[in-house]
């Protein structure tokens, strides 16, 4: 997503450090960069679709850094622009606005085909808040546990979403220290459900 790309562009260290100062001291530059990112991403997305992509996922890994006042301008608006463009290509779009608290508002404003949730989201609450398909949610740290706990947590997610369109996935990336055998076990658990 444009916002997350911008965060990486303006922060030399951790995205959480000095972001607010950069954000407020360089507002016009930030808006110019966001417009350029929108154009660049649309070219990139078009090439992806031309080369066989059947669905596009927009990752906004740093959306949660923004307060409620700034979310519409820096997350909702630029992401909506991309979603509209992707849908005009007749391709469904998944949005992953990690760390935001207002998934219902996001879905109603941005209108993705699917919403991907992070591991801090209450799966029962999101199920009541949104009517579109949901992806993800399970904490990747559970893969560092034992098979019994992993199966129990995976089954909990599958049970919660059994009557709602759901794509099983983690609520963020696989941790580097994850045993590949645990990933195999997770896949088997989901397939056997």
Q: What residue spans do the PLM features occupy?
A:
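Active-site loop segments of alpha/beta catalytic cores
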Residues: 1-193
């Amino acid at each position: 997503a444009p916002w997350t790309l911008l965060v990486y562009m303006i922060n030399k260290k951790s995205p959480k450090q000095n972001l607010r100062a950069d954000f407020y001291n360089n507002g016009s530059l930030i808006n110019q960069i966001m417009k350029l990112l929108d154009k660049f991403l649309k070219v990139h997305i078009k090439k992806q679709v031309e080369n066989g992509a059947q669905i596009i996922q927009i990752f906004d890994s740093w959306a949660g850094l923004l307060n409620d006042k700034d979310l519409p301008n820096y997350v909702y608006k630029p992401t909506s622009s991309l979603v509209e463009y992707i849908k005009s290509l007749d391709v469904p779009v998944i949005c992953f606005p990690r760390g935001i608290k207002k998934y219902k508002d996001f879905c109603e404003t941005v209108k993705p085909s699917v919403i991907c949730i992070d591991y801090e989201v209450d799966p029962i609450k999101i199920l009541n808040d949104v009517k579109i398909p949901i992806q993800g949610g399970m904490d990747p740290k559970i893969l560092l546990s034992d098979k019994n706990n992993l199966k129990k947590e995976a089954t909990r997610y599958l049970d919660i979403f059994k009557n709602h369109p759901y794509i099983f996935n983690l609520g963020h990336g696989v941790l580097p220290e994850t045993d590949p055998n645990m990933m195999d076990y997770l896949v088997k658990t989901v397939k056997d459900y």
